[in-house]
Amino acid sequence: MRISPSEAAMKLSLSPPPYADAPVVVLISGLGGSGSYWLPQLAVLEQEYQVVCYDQRGTGNNPDTLAEDYSIAQMAAELHQALVAAGIKRYAVVGHALGALVGMQLALDYPASVTMLVSVNGWLRINAHTRRCFQVREQLLHSGGAQAWVEAQPLFLYPADWMAARAPRLEAEDALALAHFQGKNNLLRRLNALKRADFSHHADRIRCPVQIICASDDLLVPSACSSELHAALPDSQKMVMRYGGHACNVTHPETFNALLLNGLASLLHHREAACKELL
């Protein structure tokens, strides 16, 4: 994948390594694109790993005007190039929804670099229900603009009782999201890239270990999508959270973090040990 000079300058946020040669974990958010999505995971991850967060191209502190044909492959290529420029050659990926798609693309295109993948509420190709949800959200965007999109978004991310107990927090988050809205064109081009992505014929070529985490009450992405992903991948394990919704890492971080840390410890460290034995 060819990267333009502007794309090559994508900014990353790197935590200090907790010890020499600490494994690197790259966090990739979903359609919103903001690295701050992973705030509930940072403190625990940074104790064991060097953590990379970033705002995706066209969002936050990486502003840009995206091409109409912008793709998941481009998202993967520009991230990999930014990591290489930062001196990072091997890394694990934790991706949420769209971020999980980018993670799979990285594993396919740069197999020598990706040590492990964690897919959070991801999929092989977009499910009919997920497509329907996005059609409704697109209609809201076209008819009501950014404010309608932002105000509807929590309905697809969080369980109803969790939202009801946190109304002031959600109002504050809505205001922040509206102030930092990525723009209609960029959002639609990123969404179209998500909808076009199809790994159903390529997932069996992903050789790194994959941890799959999903929530059974996810309104946007049915948990069956993670089951299909699990069946298609050669080396994967699947964990199901009974509660948490699409943004389960935000709504139930204690449970999610425990699953994530255990998965990284068992799969990533096992893979690294095996690689060292081969050297």
From Swiss-Prot:
Keywords: Hydrolase. One of its GO terms (cellular component) is membrane. The lineage of its organism: Bacteria, Pseudomonadati, Pseudomonadota, Gammaproteobacteria, Enterobacterales. This is Putative carbamate hydrolase RutD. It catalyses: carbamate + 2 H(+) = NH4(+) + CO2. GO terms for biological process: nitrogen utilization; uracil catabolic process. GO terms for molecular function: hydrolase activity, acting on carbon-nitrogen (but not peptide) bonds, in linear amides. It is an enzyme of class 3 (hydrolase). Residues 23-126 form the AB hydrolase-1 domain.
